[in-house]
Swiss-Prot record:
It is found in: Secreted; Cell surface. It holds the Pfam family Cu-oxidase. This is Multicopper oxidase abr1. CDD domains: CuRO_2_Fet3p_like, CuRO_3_Fet3p. Cu cation 2 binds at residues 79, 121, 485. GO terms for molecular function: copper ion binding; ferroxidase activity. It comes from Aspergillus fumigatus (strain ATCC MYA-4609 / CBS 101355 / FGSC A1100 / Af293). The gene is abr1.
């Protein structure tokens, strides 16, 4: 376990034989205090933070998951992994699987066929901000850049109340609201799930690969490595030509990842701070919202050259200009130099905004808000004939968009809202052709400065009252979400669904253990969102559904795992009722005792941090915790051109004349 510490591993560069990585995970409630305030968190195997998953290209990942929460269903999404022809392993509840009920188990199994920086998290409402999240790093046997060692840093916003409470508050505030409501404020920013406790041990004249993973719920993060040269070399699993950041700062939206090369100094004269700040523009300025007295959006980590020397304060960073102070990810060039996808076959426009529906504020795509289907959308597609599966009306209120195999698809997202939205696509990376600055206006058919080799990623921040243009090739049959990655907005329907390559999708089969968890909800796999299962014609002409056992629906399955009825019926109320993951600190020169006690039993000081949070905030004592371990966080293991207005469109897929617009 790594309570808010950076952990560094060395790994031997060279050939590594492919292997099976078998993990047994029990999803449980754990009492933890990442910023000194004790609260229930969702952990794995009675520990929190959740473990990092390290793998090598070519491995096979096998994760057996048991839901030991007792009072919530769950599931695991592998964020950024395309799951080519293994769409049932995407882990999106009511999209590619039924939610995993308390006391039940299921397996995720897929080939590790992508390299780079990813993460895993629950796709059940509100669970990953409650702690069910962790990095997933896949090492490349032949990286395009040389480096000596590597670290992983996660960035997140943290809350003192559980999400179930905050979501109820957020929903209550939306009743009668005309233009959306203010999201609940976080209590702290965390680096590696700790507040002002993370240190990276470094040596002079070395180059380190640092994976940055924004696992947050709402605001983006800005990170600064004081007085060090850094170059961006990877975004969202794509190696890019090295891009020196120079005086620009790194900003990551929720769900985004980035890897940098950091060159260390040639001496050990001093240590250096790493400054991380939650995006105050998103939380306050774009919402015309006052900053509460005492609110602290920042946290600090350190590059430690000499443990005997002091840890300096964070660098003095004043106001940030969103138009000029950050590295623009559109300048990155994929190391593969993959060319711009041209001749667009299908253009999809998302006009996104907020409106009133049934007396409450909701988000919409083209006037429609996403509503969870009664059964997973993938199962609906698999149970239909290939012809019927192309009928968008089959899928209910999931904002479905059907695309056919091999099509070049262009998605235009017009953000009619006054704040930023990070959009994530499952099953793909997309090329980013264009993204405006804040208040940059909506897409009018014109492009400006389109790269001939656009950056590829799976999560993009779309600016307030602006737009973004994305392209991908539909070569991954399945059902894939495309959604805002702010959990508050997902609860209010800011989600779409891609029904991709319906004719080829029927080659996908649903594992038996995935089928067995559906009867727990009385949800048959197959049929339409509101009908019982039915036999559907298969491409080979055979009748019936080979994905599902040929027995009456609801009949007990003797091979199904027994339900565990001993689970608690709710979240424990005190630390004594939880598994205690911290224990006594081990005697080790590398791991001094924790500088704080994860408990709220002591009399807390007056809580002036934010009035809406309960009392019990225990200040964290200054000073880092440093640990070396074979577990968790660490382990080594452009040319821009204007392509013109059409930029690959056939004449009937876009409007406008000649020339380039000024959006950037």
């Amino acid at each position: 376990m790594f309570h808010s510490r950076a952990l560094l591993l060395s790994w031997l560069v060279g050939f590594t034989a492919a292997k099976d990585i078998h993990l047994d995970w029990n999803i449980t409630w754990v009492w933890a205090a990442p910023d000194g305030f004790g609260r229930p968190m969702i952990g794995i195997n009675n520990e929190w933070p959740c473990p990092i998953v390290n793998a090598d290209l070519g491995d096979r990942l096998i994760v057996d998951v048991h839901n030991g929460l007792g009072n919530q269903s769950t599931g695991i999404h592998w964020h950024g992994f395309h799951q080519y022809m293994t769409g049932t392993m995407d882990g999106s509840n009511q999209v590619t699987q039924c939610a995993l009920p308390p006391g039940s188990s299921m397996r995720y199994e897929f080939d590790v066929n992508q390299t780079g920086t990813y993460w895993y998290h629950s796709h059940e409402m509100g669970q990953y901000p409650d702690g069910l999240r962790g990095p997933f790093i896949v090492r490349d046997p032949s990286p395009p850049f040389a480096y000596d060692d590597e670290f992983t840093l996660t960035l997140t916003d943290h809350y003192h109340e559980q999400m179930s409470v905050l979501l109820q508050q957020y929903e209550a505030d939306s009743v009668g609201a005309q233009a959306g409501v203010n999201e609940p404020l976080p209590a702290a920013a965390l680096i590696n799930e700790g507040f002002d406790t993370t240190t990276l041990r470094v040596e002079p004249n070395k180059t380190y690969l640092i994976h940055l993973v924004c696992v947050g719920n709402w605001p983006g993060h800005v990170i600064v490595f004081d007085d060090h040269e850094i170059s961006v070399v990877e975004v969202d699993g794509t190696w890019v030509d090295a891009y020196p950041a120079r005086d620009k700062k790194i900003r990551l939206a929720t769900g985004q990842r980035m890897s940098i090369l950091l060159k260390t100094k040639d001496n050990t004269d001093r240590n250096y701070a790493i400054w991380d700040s939650m995006d105050v523009n998103m939380m306050f300025f774009y919402q015309n919202r006052a900053i509460p007295e005492g609110f602290n959006p920042n946290t600090t980590a350190w590059l430690v050259y000499d443990e005997a020397k002091e840890l300096p304060p964070a660098p003095d960073v004043h106001e940030l200009d969103p138009n000029n102070d950050f590295v623009d990810d559109l300048v990155f060039v994929p190391a593969s130099h993959e060319p711009l996808l041209e001749k667009v076959d299908r253009q999809i426009i998302f006009d996104t905004g907020v409106t009133q529906r049934d007396g409450r504020s909701v988000y919409t795509i083209n006037g429609q808000t996403y509503v969870d289907p009664e059964e997973p959308t993938l199962y609906t597609a698999l149970a239909a004939s290939p012809e019927n599966a192309s009928n968008a009306s089959l899928y209910g209120q999931v904002n479905p968009f059907v695309v056919q195999y091999g099509e070049v698809v262009e998605i235009i997202i017009n953000n009619h809202h006054g704040n930023l939205h990070p959009w994530h696509m499952h099953g793909h990376q997309f090329q980013v052709l264009q993204r405006t600055i804040p208040e940059g206006g909506y897409f009018d058919g014109y492009f400006a400065n389109i790269s001939s080799t656009p950056v590829k990623r799976d999560t993009i921040m779309v600016q307030n009252h602006g737009h973004a243009v994305l392209r991908f090739r539909a070569n991954n049959p399945g059902v894939w979400l495309i959604h805002c990655h702010i959990e508050w907005h997902v609860t209010k329907g800011l989600t779409g669904t891609l029904i991709e390559a319906p004719a080829q999708m029927h080659k996908i089969s649903v594992p038996l253990d995935h089928q067995r968890i559906c009867p727990s909800y009385g949800t048959p796999p197959g049929g339409t969102p509101s009908s019982p299962p039915h036999d559907a014609p298969r491409p080979d002409g055979a009748s019936g559904s080979p994905q599902y056992p040929p027995k009456p629906w609801g009949e007990p399955d003797a091979s199904a795992p027994e339900q565990d009825d001993s689970q608690p019926g709710g979240t424990p109320d005190s630390p004594e009722d939880f598994p205690q993951p911290w224990g006594e600190p081990e005697e080790s020169p590398q791991e001094p005792p924790q500088p704080w006690s994860p408990s709220n039993n002591a009399q807390p000081p007056a809580n002036t941090y934010a009035p809406e949070y309960p009392s019990g905030y225990v200040p964290v004592a200054p000073g880092p915790v440093i640990i070396d371990s074979e577990l968790h966080y660490g382990g080594k293991s452009s040319h821009v051109e204007c392509s013109g207005v059409n930029a690959g469109h056939t004449q009937d897929t876009t409007t406008g004349g000649d020339g380039c617009a000024n959006a950037s």
